[in-house]
Amino acid sequence: MRVMINGFGRIGRTVLRAWLKGGWPGLQITAINDIAPAETCAYLLEYDSVFGPLDGVSLESDTLVVQGHRLPLTHVADISSLDLTGVDLVLECTGKAGTIDVASRGLRAGALRVLISGPSEAAEATLVLGANDHLLRPGMQIISNASCTTNALAPLARLLDEAFGITTGWMTTIHCYTGSQPTVDAPRSTDPARNRAAALSMVPTTTSAGLLLDRVLPDLAGHIDCAAVRVPTASVSAVDLCVLPARPLTAEAVNAVLRAAGGVIGVTEKPLVSSDLRARPESIIMALPETRVTGGGLIRVFGWYDNEWGFSCRMLDMALRISEAPA
């Protein structure tokens, strides 16, 4: 499958870094589009403040050469002006594909399908690996890969619901700051708190994960609500999930279910901190020592997720799944 990356920001660059490490032999990244100059694209790929330097990066005019791969760069705001004939899938990583007009630009340029790295009202389906990816159908052209937090929460919620039933629940994501937040106090968001300096405070705010969870797992719609606290760290976030099960359980029984999960759900028995989970490929890594069950039967589980690296791996995984479904 021939893949183009549109938007070479945090997710676009991390997708490329993850792809270079291998594991997706059926995918061939062939081109990149970003409005930034070629020199900036190359520099930010080579030197990353979170993941460190990347060897083998050079620039030949508007061709990015990375570890032997030659990737032509274009710099247009609207990719419908490009000729994308021969591109099987556009990884839409601009963060701006919420409408059908923007989301379909790759299709109008000749690409066969589009996978969006975030929520979008234009998507024919919002799919999460390990939760509802079985709903992928031939002929789907615009697909949303949901969000990093939804990719962490949805497989976990499905697992727990199938194991013992979820009556109701609450999830708080403890989320590192992102590019949507200012580095100094500035009017950036309709949420007043998100306008405060990202690296100086914990910021209570909203998350799209609750809405997206209802789309991904409609049987749980209205059963789990969500909130977020943005914290002054640069990478790795956490899901703190409390649920009331349909029947009484022990912490040991819950952890047995988590240990047996596999797939995109990892586990750790160690007392780790967020920086220990950097560049982990799983959608979520459950911290088993943090599992609690109250006398009233409420279950609390806690899991880490690298909101950039893990989600980028899911973008590549979903691209591979899409390649198996005829256009």
What are these language model-derived features?
Residues 95, 148, 205, 246, ...:
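Structured loop/turn residues at secondary-structure junctions
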Residues 97, 151, 248-249, 310:
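A generic structural signal for alpha-helix starts
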Residues 281-327:
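NAD(P)-dependent Rossmann-like dehydrogenase/reductase catalytic/cofactor-binding core
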